[in-house]
Amino acid sequence: KFMKIHRDIPEAVAKICAQSDVKKFIQVSAIGANENSKSLYQRSKFQGEARALTNFKNTVIIRPSVVCGTEDNFTNLFSKLSILPIIPVVGINYKFQPILVTDVADAIVKAIEAKNNHGKIYEIGGPQIISFGDMVKSIVKTLNKKRFVVEMPMPIAKIQSSILSLLPIPPVLTRDQ
C-alpha cells in the first residue's frame, strides 16, 4: 500500500496538474524520505517526491517531522496504550522534532504564496527536540496518569509486529515502522 499511496498517487496528481491550469502542486512527504533507506515507507515517500517533481515542474515538497494534533495517530496511540501499567517503546532514546498540524498547514500556505520555489524541498519540524520516550511520558502526564515507559528490544518488536500483521485488523505499527 505504501507504493500506491506514497508513490503512485503523487505521480498521478502531478500528471493531472501538468495537463491542467494548476500553478503549483504541494506534495506533503515525510522527513527521512530517502531512496536508499532500509524502510519501505521512506523509500516510497522519496519515490513519490521524485515522480511528482519529474511530472510537474511546479511541485514543492514539504517534509514534516512527526505531525501531532487532536486527531493524530501518534499521540492517540499512546493515549490508548496508557491503559496499560507499562508502556513498551521501541527506540526510546530516538530524538525527533514533532510538529503541530497547524504549523504544517501554515508551512503549506507559505509554500503556496512563495514565489520561485518550484522544485524546492522543505524539511520542517517543531521547535523542540525530544526523545521518543520523553514524548510518550509527556502524553501520559498530560492524561494525569502514572505509567512506566520502558524500552522494547527490537527483536521482540519485530516478532510482535509480524504476529499483529496476521490479524484481520490494521496493526498498531507495521514491521517497517
Predicted regions mapped to residue ranges:
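NAD(P)H-binding glycine-rich loop region in Rossmannoid oxidoreductase-like domains
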Residues: 1-12, 16-19, 31-35
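Short alpha-helix in the Rossmann-fold core of NAD(P)-dependent oxidoreductases
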Residues: 2-7, 26, 45, 97
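Conserved catalytic Lys-bearing alpha helix of Rossmann-like short-chain dehydrogenase/reductases
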Residues: 7-13, 44-52
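Conserved cofactor-binding/catalytic machinery of classical short-chain dehydrogenase/reductase
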Residues: 9, 24, 47-48, 100-103
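Conserved beta-loop-beta element that borders a ligand/cofactor-binding pocket
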Residues: 29, 49-73, 80
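Substrate-positioning beta->alpha
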Residues: 73-74, 91-113, 120-123
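A short C-terminal helix-loop "cap" of Rossmann-like NAD(P)-dependent dehydrogenase/epimerase domains
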Residues: 78-90
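Mid/C-terminal beta-alpha module of Rossmann-like enzyme folds, strongest
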Residues: 111-176
